[in-house]
Regions:
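Recognizes extended acidic, P/S/T-rich segments that occur
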Residues: 222-240
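Extracellular hydrolytic enzyme modules, especially secreted metalloproteases
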Residues: 1-89, 100-102
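Beta-strand secondary-structure signal
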Residues: 183, 210-212, 224
Length: 240
């Protein structure tokens, strides 16, 4: 059979968590479908921090929707932890769900009956295997050093619809924080390259020295200048 959402959704095998005594909590997609939450639309070059989803505080039910060029295909990112109704999940971390909406499949209740899954997770371990509880342990992000979902990562940020076949919106530095929140960068821009400062002038006086050097106007930079006497036995460190 196909993976679908397996243990990660109440509408799939998640209803049997803890032998059915503690079914998994609602996913971000399910809460959005019911009109209970709205997705956060991300802005490029921004770091997002997500509180724990389903933590009995409506303000914490935050999920980010990464849209493709086709409005019917997108990713959902939410931070899930083993607490509350989620206590018996196979793992904890950021769940990334890949939605490929097809009205006919939704209406006929055949969302995941085909090789092109209408709703399934993107597993951090690149292994859609639900044959055992342990096999699901690597599904959430980050996992075993895998902390980025990009066009070239493994798994890759693939698409099912259109000719593009890649999302083209890197999600990087996926991190679980000590306080239980989870963070990631969305389409992070390149860091500016800082060149080595060049001394442009030095003016010696009886009581000191004045030096000027090239500066990086687009960067917040702190410079250190070490002044040494001729005998090189002592030095004075100045910050500018």
């Amino acid at each position: 059979g196909y993976f679908g959402m397996s243990d990660w959704s109440l509408m799939d095998y998640g209803c049997y968590n803890n032998e059915g005594y503690t079914p998994i909590g609602y996913s971000a997609y399910e809460k959005n479908f019911m009109g209970w939450i709205e997705y956060t639309e991300p802005v490029e070059n921004t770091r997002y921090t997500l509180p724990v989803f389903n933590s009995k505080n409506a303000d914490n039910d935050v999920a980010v929707k990464v849209s493709s060029s086709n409005r019917n295909e997108y990713y959902i990112i939410e931070n899930r932890a083993r607490q509350g109704w989620d206590r018996y999940m196979p793992a904890e971390g950021m769940m990334i769900t890949h939605v490929t909406y097809d009205p006919q499949k939704w209406e006929s209740n055949s969302v995941n009956n085909y090789s092109t899954q209408g709703m399934t997770i993107i597993p951090a371990d690149n292994n859609l295997d639900n044959k055992s509880y342990d096999a699901l342990a690597g599904d959430l992000w980050p996992y075993n050093g895998n902390d980025a979902l990009t066009d070239d990562s493994r798994p890759a940020a693939v698409l099912n619809l259109g000719s593009q076949r890649r999302m083209g919106k890197p999600i990087t530095e996926l991190t679980l924080n000590p306080d239980g929140t989870a963070s990631f960068w969305y389409v992070r821009g390149e860091l500016p390259k800082i060149s080595t400062p060049q001394i442009t002038s030095i003016d010696h006086t009886t009581n000191g020295v004045t030096a000027t050097w090239s500066h990086e106007p687009e960067c917040d930079v702190t410079y250190s200048v070490e002044v040494r006497p001729h005998n090189n036995l002592e030095s004075l460190l100045l910050l500018a």
